[in-house]
Design a protein with these regions (language model features):
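Autoinhibitory N-terminal propeptides
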Residues: 1-74, 79-130, 140, 237
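C-terminal subdomain of the subtilisin-like protease fold in secreted/lumenal serine endopeptidases
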Residues: 261, 265-274, 292, 296-298, ...
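Active-site glycine-centered loops adjacent to acidic/histidine catalytic or metal-binding residues
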Residues: 145, 305, 513
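Edge beta-strands of jelly-roll/beta-sandwich modules across compartments, strongly enriched
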Residues: 396, 422-432
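Hydrolase catalytic cores
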Residues: 210-213, 230-238, 256-266, 348-350, ...
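Extracellular S/T/G-rich loop segment that most often corresponds to the catalytic His/Ser-adjacent loop
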Residues: 168-187, 310-397, 401-406, 416-417, ...
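Short acidic, glycine-rich surface-loop motifs adjacent to enzyme active sites
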Residues: 232-234, 252-280, 303-304, 417-419
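Subtilisin-like serine protease catalytic core
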Residues: 127-246, 263, 267, 297, ...
Length: 581
């Protein structure tokens, strides 16, 4: 049976096929289509799942740069002219393009029941009859983020030496060792230190995350404050303001590999995500994260994002004879963007698009592959995709590309016309709020299933945010469940509003977002692995077992009567209650 449908390889994800069909001018005006493509070199960076050996792949594609990852995944950079050759190899099982990632930008420690189990607290006598006295010693806390202010006292021991075991700066393609970091700290001033270790956290995001998970200093001490830190500063190989999923996959491969080499348990923190995908855990990024989480003594914690009130999701059910009209407001000076529509493949319906001026595309019936539709001021690329070997979901992707600089502002309408309905559920997602004008949104948005990818990965411990001052769900926090209701996400919530933590450049600051809820759970996971693995109480306390203990220990919040629910999962983090009886 042919691997081609309408001349397109079924091994390539829908968005990649559409990107390859687009002209360079169209890609240039579409952030989603251009991601992964270098216009200067005419090369693509792609994610593949494969079998066999990398050497065999390299032999068949000598012009390609192949970066093997664990578990049969790899990142490939190759000329556009060879993408079809890559898809034609029997070793290659599936191909995706990278996606852009966005950051998910003390009373809280007391509120999460962490203080009773931390070393140095008077109440730290025992946990359900077992000695606690935990600080994270003997564990690794991995921060994959924007870097870290290694000069900050939160990340230095009492003698001034570094707590950072290794720092991989992907932008510099340089790994700094503990010894190099200590030499930099011995230089005295920041200016002299940066002459030795040049890595800086420009945004401060990673420093703030690390301070919550593992900060050491003073009144704002973090959770696993004696754990060793393993830090990756995500790179941006092209002129992007945010990293991509390919950098994240390389970072995961590195930190999990180092932890296994050093035979240390590791809690990995991921405080970013994106909205592109079916939100059912089946993308290559999500399955790769699952494979990493299944490695021994590893727990991966992911924030659910800040799209809860972003009005970037619309969901509903189609019924025969009842078309649905979805209203999409586009703000002034909005550049090109894409709209994803996901449904089950067994349902069949057509699409009609109306511009703010009332012009219609006419009814667009299913036709696999790319279709070009032209307005006076925009071009719309529409792509009816196929289900993949990993998901029954079908994507209809709409990319609005301005002929000038901006999309026509005003009220756009997307009409869904049922033709054959067996299930009827549909979901539409816009890009992350940080990529859009504030006025660009669905008018009748659906707040559920607004969690970002990869928090939809089944093996991740997915964390939303609540306000510990009001004991209420934080309305910005990405909600579950995953699409079609499974898996149940988030598993739990942690404080994410006005959290005091380390500031890049020195001192402390208040931060808000699920970015800063996730590290409460990351630090807690490190403490649990110290108790279980390092202290010898349970050598298997990691991954899904650790997740189960956290879920069982989660406490209820006022106003939340049914658990699990889409807002807070099974409840709020309570570490003291999460240890086994």
């Amino acid at each position: 049976m042919s691997e081609l449908v309408n001349g397109k390889s079924q091994k390539k994800e829908n968005l990649l096929n559409l990107s390859l069909d687009a002209t360079e001018a169209e890609r240039e005006k579409s952030p989603a289509l251009q991601m992964g493509y270098d216009q200067n070199t005419k090369r693509w960076e792609l994610i593949i799942q494969y079998n066999g050996t990398v050497e065999k792949l390299q032999e068949q594609l000598p012009q390609a740069e192949i970066y093997p990852l664990s578990g049969g995944y790899a990142i490939v950079r190759l000329p556009e002219s060879q993408v079809d050759d890559l898809a034609g190899l029997s070793q290659v099982e599936y191909i995706e393009k990278p996606k852009r990632l966005y950051f998910e930008v003390n009373r809280a420690i007391r509120d999460t029941c962490i203080a009773p189990v931390q070393s140095g607290n008077q109440v730290s006598q025992n946990v359900y009859g077992r000695d606690a006295d935990l600080s994270g010693r003997g564990t690794l806390t991995a921060i994959i983020d924007s870097g870290i202010d290694y000069f900050h006292p939160d990340f230095r021991n009492a003698d001034g030496t570094t707590r950072i075991a290794a720092l991989w700066d992907q932008e510099q393609n340089r790994i700094y060792t503990r010894e190099e970091l200590n030499r930099a700290l011995e230089a005295g001033s920041r200016e002299r230190a940066y002459e030795i270790v040049q890595s800086r956290d420009v945004s401060g995001h990673g420093t703030a995350v690390a301070g919550i998970a593992a900060g050491l200093d003073g009144a704002y001490r973090g959770i696993a404050y004696e754990s060793d830190l393993l830090v990756v500063k995500l790179g941006t190989p092209l002129a992007d303001s945010f990293p991509r999923t390919t950098e994240l996959m390389r970072a995961l491969d590195y930190v999990v590999g180092i932890a296994q080499e050093w035979r240390m348990p590791v809690a990995v923190n991921l405080s970013f995500g994106n909205t592109y995908g079916s939100h059912d855990g089946t993308s290559l990024l999500e399955t790769y994260l699952n494979s990493m989480a299944e490695r021994g003594r590893t727990s991966i914690i992911v924030g659910t994002g800040n799209e809860g009130y972003g009005m970037g999701h619309r969901a509903g059910f189609l019924q025969m004879g009842r078309p649905v009209e979805i209203e999409l407001a586009v703000g002034e000076y909005q550049t090109g963007f894409g709209v994803q529509l996901w449904k089950l493949y067994q349902d069949r319906f057509s699409v009609e698009i109306f511009s703010p001026g009332g012009s219609s595309t006419g009814v667009i019936r299913e036709s696999l592959g790319a279709q070009r539709l032209s307005y006076e001021t925009e071009e719309i690329l529409l792509y009816y995709g196929m289900p993949s070997p990993y998901s029954q979901a079908q994507e209809i992707y709409l990319d609005l590309i301005p002929k000038g600089s901006y999309i026509q502002d005003g009220l756009w309408k997307i009409r869904l016309i049922p033709e054959e309905i067996r299930d009827g559920q549909y979901d539409l997602w816009l890009p992350a709020g940080m990529a859009l004008n504030r006025e660009t949104r669905f008018l009748a948005a659906s707040p559920d299933t607004t969690l970002t990818i990869p928090s939809t990965a089944s093996r991740a411990i997915s964390v939303g945010a609540y306000d510990d001052a009001t004991q209420a769900y934080a309305d910005f926090s990405g909600r579950g469940f995953a699409r079609l209701g499974h898996p149940i996400k988030p598993e739990l919530v942690a404080p994410g509003v006005n959290i005091i933590t380390a500031r890049a450049g020195g001192g402390y600051e208040a931060v808000t977002g699920t970015s800063f809820a996730a590290p409460f759970v990351t630090g807690s996971a490190a403490l649990m692995m110290q108790w279980g693995i390092v202290n010898g109480n349970d050598p298997y306390l990691y991954g899904e077992k650790l997740k189960a203990y956290l879920i069982r220990g989660a406490r209820s919040l006022p106003g939340e009567t049914v658990y699990p629910n889409e807002r807070v999962g099974y409840g709020a983090l309570c570490l003291e209650r999460s240890f086994p009886l």
